[in-house]
């Protein structure tokens, strides 16, 4: 009996040995195991802070270009050409399908790369842009136009709205508004054009919604403040601007990169490491400041940061004090106030102030990607003034009551956009990751902001 059991055990051992050899042979014929890359969060859903366990990533505030495709060596298979190409409907939220709910598309970028303040060498990161306060929305702008046009003014008070000729108005429903009366009509024209240029560039979150009104002492809107109108010495029939009065605004001091006592600006760029040690709040502030500098260059506004630069010649500490016509709202958004020096009056005296405006612009080599796209599109279209006036006339019924942008000023607006576009390309060539890449834009389809 024992002999039979030993024989059975030996036979079983031989079978196991044969099976092991067969499995080894099969394993040698299979292709080597392919390691899947570690899953990474998509770049366009990067949260500003590490997400707590189980917390979903916030949706991006603006539609973003699709993630870049990366090859095995870590290089992009798409060039900067694709990065700044405007896809159809680029400003509309992407449609979500049921099949996409659980889909995860890794961006191919490592975590340290995605958490940088700048991507592509010259663009603020998308995660950082998500932290910029919302400011004024399109819905607020539309609501204000409706309120201001139908409002009855019941009081006009001095103070609280800038220049002494302006007034703080109170409407019958209790709403307060700043009424700006220009020393000459071109100031109100410049204020209105600057507002609609901000909308054309996607910067309306920083500029208070504006409506125009005609001063008519016996008209329904002004009949209850006839005495105040006489005291203000406003000319009958003048066009004024109405913007909602904003409470709880605070002063704003120029951030460190431009706080120079020797009159020399420090270029703001990522390559030199100027952004390395800044806090997230400081970086969010810089995102807004770079938009402001681009906006003031395009409008030739000399009554904000440029006036500080001019004053450095006799006041070396001016950059450490509040900036004119710039405030911060309770939510943290910068508010670009009193833009009446822009476009019209600013263009008339541009030759005097561009020695400050151009170096200020050239001190910036990091941009909001959305703003850069629109600048480059307007540069390519060569019809910026036509688009501006089309947008203006579509939303403002009193548009015909103020002079349009003159042809010389329309040409100057286009030249300034061209100069800005070339500056963006120069920064990309100098500081971008792929200096040889080109930038092209499609036609005018899919802009969605006129």
From Swiss-Prot:
<comment type="similarity">
    <text>Belongs to the FJX1/FJ family.</text>
</comment>
<feature type="region of interest" description="Disordered">
    <location>
        <begin position="36"/>
        <end position="61"/>
    </location>
</feature>
<keyword id="KW-0732">Signal</keyword>
<feature type="region of interest" description="Disordered">
    <location>
        <begin position="88"/>
        <end position="111"/>
    </location>
</feature>
<feature type="glycosylation site" description="N-linked (GlcNAc...) asparagine">
    <location>
        <position position="277"/>
    </location>
</feature>
<dbReference type="InterPro" id="IPR024868">
    <property type="entry name" value="FJX1/FJ"/>
</dbReference>
<keyword id="KW-0964">Secreted</keyword>
<dbReference type="GO" id="GO:0005615">
    <property type="term" value="C:extracellular space"/>
</dbReference>
<feature type="glycosylation site" description="N-linked (GlcNAc...) asparagine">
    <location>
        <position position="248"/>
    </location>
</feature>
<feature type="compositionally biased region" description="Basic and acidic residues">
    <location>
        <begin position="93"/>
        <end position="111"/>
    </location>
</feature>
<feature type="signal peptide">
    <location>
        <begin position="1"/>
        <end position="28"/>
    </location>
</feature>
<keyword id="KW-0325">Glycoprotein</keyword>
<comment type="function">
    <text>Acts as an inhibitor of dendrite extension and branching.</text>
</comment>
<dbReference type="GO" id="GO:0010842">
    <property type="term" value="P:retina layer formation"/>
</dbReference>
<protein>
    <recommendedName>
        <fullName>Four-jointed box protein 1</fullName>
    </recommendedName>
</protein>
